[in-house]
Amino acid sequence: MGFFYFMYYVYVLFSLKDRKFYIGFTRNLKVRITQHKNGYVKSTRNRKSLILIYYEVYIQKADAEKREKYLKGGNGRSSLKIQLRDCLTKLRYKHL
C-alpha cells in the first residue's frame, strides 16, 4: 500500500489592477485561486484581475509556511523578483 501525502502550495499572484504581488499558501491551489478571483479573500478582494505567476509544492505544511514567510520578507521578495524578472517584464511590472 502506498503513502498518501497532502501537498501544500506556496503561490504568487500578480494584480493587473495595482501591479502588486500577493503571496500565500494553501492545500488546494485551484480552489484558492478561484476564491481570490471571485472576491472571497479579504486581502485581495479589491485587487481584481489577479493572475497566478508562480507556485511551489511542499509535502510538509511547516516547510510551506516557512517559505511563504521568507517570500513575504525583504530578501525573499527581492529574490522572487529576480527569479520572475522575465514574467514581470512581460506584464510591464515597473519596480524591478
Residue spans of the language-model regions?
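GIY-YIG nuclease catalytic motif and its immediate N-terminal context
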Residues: 1-41, 48-51, 55-57, 63-72, ...
